[in-house]
Amino acid sequence: MVLALLLPTAAMAEEAKEGAPKVAYITLSPPFVGNYALDGGPRLRVYKADVALRVTGDEAAKAVQHHEPLIRNQLVALFTQQTVDSMSNVEAKEHLRQEALKQVQQVMEAEEGKPIVEDLLFNNLIVQ
């Protein structure tokens, strides 16, 4: 009897899932590679960042892919401005991730009228 009562609930939950927009992760490829801490010091510092953006819905994914050159430009500028301190520990990297998300959302707001990107993930971040 309990099973019979749960079946309609499970069916309704499945229908809701089918109608809901799907989350997508868009990998910005190729990875970002460049120099940072360009303060005139004797040592050349290099970063490599594999970045993915989380969006919900096909339209959001298409918009991000359409504006990928602008997004990449903004992120390259941000990464290049970093100092040794801002790339050297976990807390600093988390702050960089949040700032990168904010800047990507600003690009999308300017181009599409809404932030669209829900999260930015570093799949890999290497600094030397």
How would you label these PLM feature ranges?
Residues 1-128:
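Flexible, low-complexity charged segments
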